[in-house]
Curated annotation (Swiss-Prot):
InterPro entries: Rbsml_uS13_C (IPR027437), Ribosomal_uS13 (IPR001892), Ribosomal_uS13-like_H2TH (IPR010979), Ribosomal_uS13_bac-type (IPR019980), Ribosomal_uS13_CS (IPR018269). Keywords: Ribonucleoprotein, Ribosomal protein, RNA-binding, rRNA-binding, tRNA-binding. Residues 94-118 are annotated as: Disordered. Located at the top of the head of the 30S subunit, it contacts several helices of the 16S rRNA. In the 70S ribosome it contacts the 23S rRNA (bridge B1a) and protein L5 of the 50S subunit (bridge B1b), connecting the 2 subunits; these bridges are implicated in subunit movement. Contacts the tRNAs in the A and P-sites. It comes from the Bacteria. Belongs to the universal ribosomal protein uS13 family. GO terms for cellular component: cytosol; small ribosomal subunit. This is Small ribosomal subunit protein uS13. One of its GO terms (molecular function) is structural constituent of ribosome. Pfam families: Ribosomal_S13. Part of the 30S ribosomal subunit. Forms a loose heterodimer with protein S19. Forms two bridges to the 50S subunit in the 70S ribosome.
Length: 118
């Protein structure tokens, strides 16, 4: 297994799909990384040489991925909550942030129904 950005990349998958196992790398970014590295999309990771894997590592290192990306996202949410803006309040209360209705639906964000106690 090749190790890129601290993640074990599956050997038996095509390079385009295998790179998506890195947090922050989807199909589009994966294709861009492979094009920049000069590697075909349909080749399997196990067929790549060490030099090609090193170029992949260098290309992935140019992007914010994995722990840095997670930290960046959580810090931006924390910043909104500290500001006390509308989006921050919605995050703090665990409600939908982007204007969805909450009278019905929004169960995923609000959690399970709480029974009414008499």
């Amino acid at each position: 297994m090749a190790r890129i950005a601290g993640i074990n990349i599956p050997d038996q998958k095509h390079a385009v799909i295998a790179l998506t196992s890195i947090y922050g790398v989807g199909k589009t970014r994966s294709k861009a990384i492979l094009a920049a590295a000069g590697i075909a999309e349909n080749v399997k990771i196990s067929e790549l040489s060490e030099e090609q894997i090193d170029t992949l590592r260098d290309e992935v290192a140019k992007f914010v991925v994995e722990g840095d990306l997670r930290r960046e996202i959580s810090m931006s949410i924390k910043r909104l909550m500290d500001l006390g803006c509308y989006r921050g309040l919605r995050h703090r209360r665990g409600l939908p942030v982007r204007g969805q209705r909450t009278k019905t639906n929004a169960r995923t964000r609000k959690g399970p129904c709480k029974p009414i106690k008499k």
